[in-house]
């Protein structure tokens, strides 16, 4: 049996936390049938013509005669497709859990340390399609889980593709994408964290979970007392049992969908093709009020594609379409066609045109700007950081933006055509909401000082090292010079801020719980406002408004040699 002790429930704010004591994997797994097949496979990537690996486990009862649930399990930082199968000293517990719960189990590489965004997300979707071709997969019972970075990735994919997945179980995730929280209405979530894990992880999860619960999403947050970062991976059996009990509704009569960029604009029978004001969320509320009537409520949407689902609508009849309080008309939309709605000067125009859906596994399909040359994170004053901080200020109207790349895992913005996916990849690892706070010029100068490297000390080793990673604060709205030969506390030798003036400052939300931007005496003590703007969403808005990405080095950050 499985033994569980000390179970109790308490409420913190709006979030119900379910506490579980130590859990032992007992004879329930030991009595499983003979082992199934643990296979190492690859697919050929259309992006770069390489073979990308994944591990898949086929339970002993799998014979291809019926469709099976599929659980996609994503590894953490520094891991690979084998980590969850062979690591964590758990004697293959994840495969035993898949066997006991009657599910196919696959773990992709995800292209390594990508946060499962950009090319990492593409890898997950390609593996899903590949496995569905090779094996009998129940597409209404496809699930996401993962640990740490993989838990964050599970949340990212489920919230961006609520029409694809039946449920998600992020384990020790780092953040939760609160601006997409309403997309959890159709995707049940089981978040599991360790009570002794870093505050960074708990804050990152809570901010999204609270918003999900506010809107009535089917969300559970469990905190394991006495457990740290690896605690949530100790009982895959219980996690998998929870997952396989859920089933996707492939043909909803109504839904609400939040969209941050057009890369993730499609769900069910609508596609946001163009956002009216990039950098702000677009929303779609769609309802089939009858078999021949659809009502749409759209916010910040400039162009929308509507492809009626034959399971929901009578596609042999003309469909009555309304947007807000406006009747768009009645339209016969044959197979292979879509209704394109465009907002022109505040009025909706509709036209039936050939459907042109983007491939789910396509890559770099959404050009947004151009760059005359590659923009990277190299140097004392980093050109990419100049552009990022300008985007943060533009999104929030703050006086100053502060950003550093101490955990940077991103990629340069390429020369030539810049796609939205390039913006998603340039900003990794973090993608949390932006926060604003009020600080004096004197306080800001001290923060700049706090983040200067000490020549006599080495910086903490990072799990991943990318060119340009480092602690020196990058800025917009100010300039400063530093001299590392000066004594600590006096190394910032010039700064153009008024020490007595109070400024509105924008930062990434993660710095409020993880001292990556060394806030000194303000860490976990300063009052701040959480904006509804995601980090990557701000970059998309800035790129779309300018159309050209070509930041200069302007002397914002200089070292005295």
Where are these regions (language model features)?
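A domain-start/cap signature at the N-terminus of enzymes
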Residues: 29-68
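Alpha/beta-hydrolase-fold serine-hydrolase catalytic core, especially in secreted/extracellular enzymes
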Residues: 36, 46-53, 214-357
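Gly/Ser-rich "nucleophile elbow"/oxyanion-hole loop immediately N-terminal to the catalytic nucleophile
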Residues: 60-67, 113-149, 159-165
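Short substrate-entry loop that stabilizes the transition state in hydrolases
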Residues: 62-116
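A conserved short beta-strand
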Residues: 163-174
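Short beta-strand/loop motif that positions the catalytic acidic residue
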Residues: 190-193
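Acidic catalytic loop of the alpha/beta-hydrolase fold
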Residues: 196-201, 229
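Catalytic centers of hydrolytic enzymes
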Residues: 331-561
């Amino acid at each position: 049996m499985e033994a569980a002790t000390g179970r109790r429930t308490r409420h913190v704010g709006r979030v119900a936390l379910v506490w579980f004591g130590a859990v032992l994997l007992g004879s329930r797994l030991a009595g499983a049938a003979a082992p199934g097949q643990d296979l190492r496979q690859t697919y050929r990537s259309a992006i770069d013509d390489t073979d990308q690996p994944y591990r898949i486990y086929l339970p002993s009862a799998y014979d291809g005669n019926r469709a099976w649930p599929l659980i996609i399990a994503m590894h953490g930082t520094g891991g690979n497709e084998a980590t969850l199968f062979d690591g964590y000293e758990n004697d293959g517990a994840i495969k035993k859990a898949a066997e006991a719960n009657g599910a196919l189990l696959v773990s992709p590489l995800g292209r390594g340390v990508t946060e499962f965004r950009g090319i990492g997300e593409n890898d997950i979707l390609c593996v899903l399609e590949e496995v569905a071709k090779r094996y009998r997969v129940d597409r209404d019972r496809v699930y996401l889980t993962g640990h740490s970075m993989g838990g964050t990735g599970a949340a990212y994919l489920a919230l961006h593709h609520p029409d694809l997945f039946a449920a998600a179980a992020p384990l020790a995730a780092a953040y939760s994408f609160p601006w997409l929280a309403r997309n959890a209405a159709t995707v049940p979530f089981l978040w599991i964290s360790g009570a002794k894990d870093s505050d960074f992880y708990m804050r990152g999860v809570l901010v999204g979970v609270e918003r999900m619960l506010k809107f009535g999403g089917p969300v559970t947050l469990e905190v394991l007392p006495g457990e740290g970062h690896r605690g949530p991976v100790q009982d895959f059996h219980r996690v998998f049992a929870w997952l396989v009990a859920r089933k996707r509704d492939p043909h909803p009569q109504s839904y609400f969908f939040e969209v941050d960029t057009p890369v993730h604009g499609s769900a069910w029978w609508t596609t946001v093709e163009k956002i009216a004001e990039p950098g702000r969320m677009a929303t779609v509320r769609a309802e089939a009020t009858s078999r021949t009537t659809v009502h749409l409520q759209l916010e910040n949407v400039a162009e929308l594609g509507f492809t009626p689902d034959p399971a929901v609508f009578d596609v042999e009849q003309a469909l009555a379409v309304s947007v807000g309080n406006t009747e768009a008309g009645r339209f016969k939309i044959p197979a292979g066609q879509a209704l394109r709605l465009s907002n022109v000067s505040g009025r909706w125009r509709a036209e039936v045109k050939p459907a042109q859906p983007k491939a789910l596994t396509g890559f770099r399909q959404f050009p947004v700007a151009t760059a005359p040359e590659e923009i990277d994170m190299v140097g004392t004053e980093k050109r990419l950081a100049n552009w990022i901080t300008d985007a943060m200020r533009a999104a929030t109207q703050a006086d100053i933006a502060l950003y550093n790349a101490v955990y940077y895992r991103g990629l340069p913005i390429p020369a030539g055509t810049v796609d939205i996916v390039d913006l998603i990849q340039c900003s990794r690892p973090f993608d949390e909401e932006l926060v604003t706070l009020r600080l004096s010029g004197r306080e800001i100068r001290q923060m700049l000082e706090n983040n200067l490297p000490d020549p006599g000390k080495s910086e903490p080793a990072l799990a991943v090292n990318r060119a340009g990673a480092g602690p020196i604060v990058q800025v917009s709205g100010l300039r400063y010079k530093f001299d590392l030969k000066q004594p600590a506390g006096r190394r910032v030798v010039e700064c153009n801020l008024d020490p007595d003036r109070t400024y509105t400052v924008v930062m990434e939300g993660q710095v409020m719980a993880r001292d990556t931007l060394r806030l000194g005496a303000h860490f976990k003590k300063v009052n701040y406002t959480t904006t509804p703007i995601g980090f990557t969403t701000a970059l998309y808005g800035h790129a779309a408004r300018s159309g050209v990405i070509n930041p200069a080095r302007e002397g914002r950050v200089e070292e005295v040699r």
